[in-house]
Amino acid sequence: MTLINIRNLGVTLGNPLFSKLNLVVNAGDRIGLVAANGRGKSTLLACITGTLEPSEGEITKARGLTIGHVAQNVPPPLFDTPFYDAVLQALPADLAESESWRVDVVLESLDVPELMRSRPLKQLSGGWQRLAMLARTWVSEPDVLLLDEPTNHLDLEKIAQLEGWLNALPRDVPVILSSHDRAFLDATTNRTLFLRPEQSPVFALPYTRARAALDEADASEARRYERDMKVAEQLRKQAAKLNNIGINSGSDLLVVKTKQLRQRAEKLEDAAKPAHLERSAGAIRLANRGTHAKVLVTLEDAAVTTPDGTLLFKTGRQFVCQGDRIVLLGLNGAGKSRLVSMLKQAIERPETARDGIKATPSLVLGYGDQALADLADTDTPIGTIIRRFDVGDQRARALLAGAGMTIDMQAKPIGQLSGGQKARLGMLVLRLAEPNFYLLDEPTNHLDIEGQETLESELMAHEASCLLVSHDRSFVRAVGNRFWLIEKKRLVEVEGPEGFFASVGG
């Protein structure tokens, strides 16, 4: 049963975000919406809800269709509203009292603890705020559910919980979701739409298989274009040769033949379409200055504690060696970020290092945290690069342009940049530090899929030694060659991440 029919849809905001978009949404569809940051995913969802008028095309919806849209952020008027009330207020006022049981059902399905339900939204973590917005949307039982980056701010446990929740929805409820989490897309979708400025292909496959099909289609298109252009070139050469013979011999027949060959060449050239070339959001490059040290960090049963001294776990005897790409696994609150912080302190200020943590003196640290706190919101990208790395204005601007920063962006306060733009600036800062050891806490948080894959490639191509924390399962599987797990207040080495993923349902 067709619920939404999108025909020849296009939106132009300066440049075309997408055009000639055709999509039929049927009962039971679970559609993954994939595009780079700022390329129109949220815009398309806004067109479907009717809050944005497209530049061209039309959207037809089934009579009486209701659409639930879970946006990326909590509306400011709801900040002071308790979790439970924020969901209750989504019901019609005349039903709020008699139908309040529906709120309880939704909150139970999302495993929201009783204590959490009475807390104002502004006091909750980003992950719980996302779940509050999801509950607020679903309590009204919409016919179609739209989710915009639903895994943002969620830890692995909550991502697995959200996957289970989505897969337990009534089978006929269509879901359209935008996400950069490849494993999440694979677990929750059965169709994939790749949003592009011209043709936006759709595949009846989850992300990974759809991406393989897309890459093959693009490669086939590139081969066809190259073949057509070669044939056109040959036709033009034949036409030029015949033209010379025709002029010298005065043959009208050869002149006509020449014209026909040129027309065939023009027809081929006009019809030939170059293969899609993704416009990069900016290059991500890393560096590795190397070190002669074999062992970079030694842990001798160090106690990892909270700032007030509460023991989280003990490390046992562990070594970080050159070439290691260690992924630190553990539940939320186990102490992953705390260990990263203690390692950072031991490398940057050895005299203040905790007992049991020793870093080789030749280490040069490349550090990135999930909040990108190392980048001051009041500073500008151009100011950051010039001051930190003693480069001139022209060189700094060239570096920023290579990272995808326009002239306007370079002079903006960093606090006004998008998460993706800040992440790429952070990666440039890492590269210019020329480290030989990386400490990365949730490095893919604000990166689109292209950025994630580039970061994976750079870490492996440079044989960079690193210790990282990430809830991105695809990234962990691609990058890690050693895995440490925090379990029962001990740090233990495990063969791979799959056992941990399975334990949290991921």
Spell out what each predicted region is.
Residues M1-E221, T291-G506:
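ABC ATP-binding cassette signature C-motif
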Residues L3, L95-A96, A213-K314:
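Flexible nucleotide-interacting loop at or near the entrance of a catalytic core
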